[in-house]
Amino acid sequence: MGQRRAALGTVSGPSTKPTLVVLAAGRARRYGGVKPLAPVGPRGEAVIDLVASDALAAGFGSIVLVLGPATGPAIRYHVEHTWPAHVDVRFALQQVPLGTVHAVLSASEHVGDTPYGVGNADDVYGRSPCSLLAAHLMALDPTNALVGFRLADAVVGTAPVTRGICQVGPDGQLRRVDERRQVTAQPDCRFAAADGREPSELSPDARVSMNLWGFTPAFHKTLQAAMAAASDASEDAEVLLPEVVAESLDTSPFTVLPAAGRCIGVTHPDDLALVQGELARQVGQGVRPAALWAPGENV
């Protein structure tokens, strides 16, 4: 199975379902473990299992996992021994941690010259938001895109988090992403950022970025150029996706796709029980299917 999954290949053709590049190379220092393998599902399913199954059910055709040398072997072993054999999954290695742009470019040979999605390996985005992105990427002439979640739907627990607050124009285009730190939920359903900046109070309806992106082939070239420029300046320069997006908005517009439903992520160890409870609640309410994969799709 491992040799089959390691086979190289590109995704091409205008009618091809898009690929989702899943960034799983992080060290997760705050969590203290391999976050993509955290057992969050009702049956002990890992975060990365839900990320992949939701994406495939929503219209993505293949998954590319960008792994790091420290946690990559454990993640790859898990995938090769638990995912259904028919799932089209490829592996890419980010040997050196040079930021999220470098991580995406590590998957270049697998995405081909077609639009593709990018997401985190430790955020359960849900099927509806993934469906929004997949449908957008399969449009006749797609733009770059960012899936925007309500702030109230993108915070789990009471521990402080960092969130990118999106400023969206009347045309639905992204104007900027304002990173706010120390964001916490308040008792009266408000949100506050204790980062010394104003406004300190944040609207629960504000759209935030949870790093669920859609990129066109033209923007992929922009990422390559940004990484090359940074590497020329310093061999160990880290380049982050939000920074390149912000610098490119004048020439590379991004459509904000407003998502409904919660984005459930694991940031701190104390989040695990909360995430498990939320996912179990979704299954009980019929929002999420009880079985991770469709009947007959077991390994």
Model segments located where?
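Conserved core of the sugar-phosphate nucleotidyltransferase
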Residues: 126-213, 217
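A structural signal for short hydrophobic beta-strand segments in well-ordered beta-sheet cores
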Residues: 37, 166-168, 256
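Short acidic/His/Gly/Ser-rich catalytic and metal-binding motifs that mark active-site loops
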Residues: 27-32, 186-188, 222
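Short glycine-enriched, charge-decorated loop/helix-capping segments at active-site entrances
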Residues: 35-40, 161
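Conserved N-terminal catalytic core of the sugar/cofactor nucleotidyltransferase
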Residues: 2-22, 28, 42-118, 125, ...
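Residue-level signal for inorganic ion chemistry
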Residues: 22, 48, 107, 122, ...
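Terminal amphipathic alpha-helical/low-complexity segments used for targeting or macromolecular assembly
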Residues: 1-7, 11-16, 52, 140, ...
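Phosphate- and divalent-cation-binding pockets in alpha/beta enzyme and binding domains
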Residues: 30, 73-75, 128, 222, ...
